[in-house]
From Swiss-Prot:
InterPro entries: Daa-tRNA_deacyls_DTD, DTD-like_sf. Pfam families: Tyr_Deacylase (PF02580). It comes from Citrobacter koseri (strain ATCC BAA-895 / CDC 4225-83 / SGSC4696). An aminoacyl-tRNA editing enzyme that deacylates mischarged D-aminoacyl-tRNAs. Also deacylates mischarged glycyl-tRNA(Ala), protecting cells against glycine mischarging by AlaRS. Acts via tRNA-based rather than protein-based catalysis; rejects L-amino acids rather than detecting D-amino acids in the active site. By recycling D-aminoacyl-tRNA to D-amino acids and free tRNA molecules, this enzyme counteracts the toxicity associated with the formation of D-aminoacyl-tRNA entities in vivo and helps enforce protein L-homochirality. The keyword Metal-binding does not apply. Signal peptide: none annotated. It is an enzyme of class 3 (hydrolase). Its main location: cytoplasm. A motif (Gly-cisPro motif, important for rejection of L-amino acids) lies at residues 137-138. It catalyses: glycyl-tRNA(Ala) + H2O = tRNA(Ala) + glycine + H(+); a D-aminoacyl-tRNA + H2O = a tRNA + a D-alpha-amino acid + H(+). Homodimer. GO terms for cellular component: cytoplasm. This is D-aminoacyl-tRNA deacylase.
Length: 145
């Protein structure tokens, strides 16, 4: 399971002209589900995403996680993160989970974020989405479990 996390000052996702999720300061989480992923991996990745210390403390050091910084989380499914790009000029998607399984694990990940008392917003699974963000830093990390 993969999370591409970006520290943002604001982010939103729109589906068919409707804003489905919007946050101020926090994390935009682009979530990719791979073929062998399960709830245990989703739990571990959620723990890492919410615990990752990429927000500045009083001394300006990256020392606070999103909860400590008072931020929110916007989770957007992105199957292309599981692409095989090692050869050729076209990505392959055999590493990605089947759509039903990917959706179930995406929803599970979102629920785990909510259970941690995070203000959690979402996109819409498998939809054509427009994601807008202001990357703060820029600060972007690839987390994989």
């Amino acid at each position: 399971m993969i999370a591409l996390i970006q520290r943002v000052t604001r982010a939103s996702v729109t589906v068919e002209g409707e804003v489905t999720g919007e946050i101020g300061q926090g994390l935009l989480v682009l979530l990719g589900v791979e073929r062998d992923d399960d709830e245990q991996k989703a739990n571990r990745l959620c723990e890492r995403v919410l615990g990752y210390r990429i927000f500045s403390d009083a001394e300006g050091k990256m020392n606070l996680n999103v909860q400590q910084a008072g931020g929110s989380v916007l989770v957007v499914s992105q199957f292309t993160l599981a692409a095989d790009t090692e050869r050729g000029m076209r990505p392959g998607f055999s590493r990605g989970a089947a759509p039903d399984r990917a959706e179930a694990l995406y929803e599970y990940f979102v629920e785990r974020c909510c259970q941690q008392e995070m203000n959690t917003q979402t996109g819409r699974f498998a939809a054509d989405m427009q994601v807008s963000l202001v990357n703060d830093g820029p600060v972007t990390f690839w987390l994989q479990v």
